[in-house]
Amino acid sequence: MLLDTLLELAGGINNVTRILAPQGQVVLALKHPPHAPHLPDDVSLQSVLGEWQLSVQRTAEVSDQQLAAIGKAIAERQKRATLPYQTALDCPYRPQWHISPPQGLLNDPNGFIYHQEEYHLFYQWHPFACEHKDKYWVHLKSLDLVHWQWQSVALTPSDWFDSHGVFSGHAVSHQQDLWLFYTGNTRLGTERQRQTMQCAARMNANGEFEKLGPVIRCLPEGVTEHIRDPKVIYTQGKWQMLLGAQTLAHQGRLAVYHSDDLLHWHFDKLYGDELGDYGYMWECPDWFELQGEAFFVFGPQGIASANPHHTIEHQNRIFRATQNAQGEIALLQGWPLDEGFDFYAPQTAQTADGRRVLCGWMGLPDETQHPSCDQGWIHQLTALRELEWREGKIYQHPLRELDTLQSEPHTLLLSDTVTELKTKSFDLQVTLPWGCELRLMQNAQYCVTLTLDAENRLLRLDRSATQIRQGDTIRELKLDSPTVELRILADQSSLEIFINQGEHVMTSRIFTPLDATGISLHGASVDAKLYYMAPASAPFNLEVNV
């Protein structure tokens, strides 16, 4: 059957919400059931989980180009549908200088890269509600890594290979072109069978991204449909694609492919056996070199924590790694990148002057019940961080360009007398003795506490006395330093605590009322340096809707 005939039976392109192509079929998902009183014998109509689907066997007459034309029509309609959701809703929890979505749900940063004298950053977005569903990519640009400008909704879940979500991936700057690699997610049938393909897109002269379709359609042997989040690098004279994967034994591993042209990929092997049973799935891989060492970053899921306060299965890790002349990868030594409540799916980019800068999602996959949901949005990205490899450790430092947002320094005496900062956007730098407790974002009822437990040499972050609705409330970090040096970046509803010059970091969403701007220190009296942080440019398409 011709595709035009099927579209006519479907009631026209405007009645088509998705296109699928499972196992030699063409399936059109419809807003409304077709009006045709009698369908041809080779066309079936069924309701699949409340969605009407019209399907027919795919013949040689139906080309990929024809399917792509339907995908483009759906994409244009999807982009128009996001326009009302590109207006930021006013909210006391909205950050002043972090990236947040105007509405809906933000998750992983994607495609973080320096290309043709500009920084590009994308993020996963579901515009219509605070839920994980049918992911889009938002495109931002910056000249300085501080002030980000909304460019477009770059990718939408419009095609047969990504109909249920444009999942995470990375960008490649090659010659004059900016390429995007991502995982296309589809769900098929009443059992919502997952089907994943690795896909590519390329930016055209108008700054729009044209999908090139799947570049890897089939699963490698021994892997489930949970294989995603491509990271593409150029090494040893060829392109390599790194993917987070799950084996048939439900163990997380790193899947590696190679290519000569970015379009045709060949599977090499799975890596990570030396870690044994290290989670049931690995997500969001990144790979980079720093001071002559190679590093592998990923999100292992299902690792048990030794601390009873840590109940979340979604973890973050960085491993020192090696790659020999044959391309074989070995994972040597690993650590958490962040010890706080809300940090996942980080990506890194190399700046124009050679620094390695990290951006993460300040959230977790299972958290969808924050107070900001009452105002129609959830989650934000972390502050950008510079990475340093020194004395066998990874150190993280706030991006130096953030200093341009700082006020003049103020000396602040921290004591048990509450000082009103009258803001939740600041940079606090202080060295504390063991045996004291710092309270932040404080009023008579709410606060977050940072306790320096002298007996156990534990730094304890406690957000149980906040408005948090979901997630853990205590994090603990073992330290052996004689004092604890802190740099705390605060922004309305978040804290990023850099400990002992960035040897450790604790990143957390902290929700307290608008008037909870007090700070106090109990058990000691110490001078601190305080900078107020000015707002960065809003990363939205339109003005804030008050």
Curated annotation (Swiss-Prot):
Q: Does the record's keyword annotation contain Oxidoreductase?
A: no
Asked if the record carries the keyword Metal-binding, the reply is no
**PROSITE patterns of this UniProt entry?**
GLYCOSYL_HYDROL_F32
What cellular component GO annotations does this protein have?
Answer: cytoplasm
Q: Where in the cell is it found?
A: Cytoplasm
Q: In which pathway does it act?
A: Glycan biosynthesis; sucrose metabolism
What catalytic activity is recorded? Answer: Hydrolysis of terminal non-reducing beta-D-fructofuranoside residues in beta-D-fructofuranosides
So what EC number does this one have? 3.2.1.26
Active site as annotated: D108
UniProt keywords (A-Z) are: Cytoplasm, Glycosidase, Hydrolase
Give binding positions for substrate. L105, L106, N107, D108, Q124, F167, S168, R228, D229, E283
CDD domains assigned: GH32_ScrB-like (cd18623)
Give one GO biological process term.
Answer: sucrose metabolic process
Q: Which Gene3D superfamilies match?
A: Exo-inulinase, domain 1, Glycosyl hydrolase domain, family 43
Q: What does this protein do?
A: Enables the bacterium to metabolize sucrose as a sole carbon source.
The family annotation for this protein states: Belongs to the glycosyl hydrolase 32 family.
Q: Which PANTHER family match?
A: BETA-FRUCTOSIDASE
Q: Name it.
A: Probable sucrose-6-phosphate hydrolase
Record gene name:
cscA
